[in-house]
């Protein structure tokens, strides 16, 4: 029986912060990896005059291409980029995923961040875990789920890493190629920056 691992991200390209680990776990027989995005990144091209609907379609397609290259499917909670607020509907939708396929581990964004959607993302993940576990007298009934946070050097505040994931040159090249698929968000530039920060 496979163990379920969830990567819960605010936007389609936020997976880049933990791409190496996602790549590795997606090749492990014992794990089924789930990529869940809170929003479709609808406002990611607003400075270029692209409508939210068109932007969502572009970014959804890019995320599906990246996930598809790893043999994964992306799932969506349908909050709106820039307006995500950990709605009960989003938390319950993720909780329903957790109930159907209980998580062994959850990787999500560090909750102290300059981007509000990043902050909300971890709240949704933790609320969904709480909803799926059930609560008695304010205490979660059972939780055997590991929760890990990832961060961005430019956005996250006060994050001190405690775990590192080693990658060889071949894995870095694959990671670079995957990140480059996020073309509308300057994927090649992000991949170069990520390589420098790694």
Give the label of every model feature segment.
Residues 3-52:
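ATP-dependent adenylation/pyrophosphate-handling site
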Residues 41-73:
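Glycine-rich phosphate-binding loop and adjoining beta1-alpha1-beta2 segment
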Residues 1-8, 28, 32, 54, ...:
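Metal-dependent de-N-acetylase/amidase catalytic core
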